[in-house]
Amino acid sequence: MFDTIISNGIIIDGTKKPRYQADIGIQNGNIKTVGDLSNSKAKNIINAENLIISPGFIDMHTHSDISLVNDKYGESKAYQGVTTEVTGNCSFSPFPAGKKGPNNLKKGLWETAALADDPNTNWTWNTLNDWANTIEKNGTSINIAPQLGYLSLIHI
């Protein structure tokens, strides 16, 4: 018995094979079987008839570095099929803060890059690890691949 079966979906798997219709059996958060599962049982069944199922997309150019701190669900990305974001683009990253602290970095990035900041975000991190721990503590539903923006280095 599966936890979830996604049934009747049109699968485009990124391998250059033609699209095909199949079911997907999920157990413990992992895909276990792809094929005809019409005789299988599951706790949850999602009917994906006439819907496309594909692997998650990687968004290589994002500016979600700050919004990820507050947006634990990443809904704007998840609804588009994005499962991984690359941050730190266009020379901006919210770390390292250096000896002058995160508020100096925040101010410098605002003045230099016209950074749109959520006023509810309290920049308490100084390093990549601090930033990543803040996001992990708050929770997130997507994977993050951070880059160090060189503009941040100017302000430390």
Question: Where do the language-model regions lie?
Answer:
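Histidine-rich, glycine-flanked metal-binding segment
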Residues: 1-5, 10-56, 71
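Ser/Thr-centric signal marking residues that sit
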Residues: 4, 15, 62, 83-84, ...
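Acidic/polar N-terminal loop/beta-strand segments that form early-domain functional surfaces
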Residues: 27, 63, 88
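Adenylate-forming
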Residues: 29, 155-156
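Glycine-rich nucleotide phosphate-binding loop and flanking beta-alpha elements
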Residues: 38, 66, 93
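Residue-level signal for pocket-adjacent positions within structured domains
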Residues: 40-41, 63-64, 148
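Di-metal (Zn2+ and/or Mg2+/Mn2+) metal-binding site signature of metallo-dependent hydrolases
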Residues: 53-76
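Divalent-metal coordination cores built from histidine and acidic residues
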Residues: 70-154
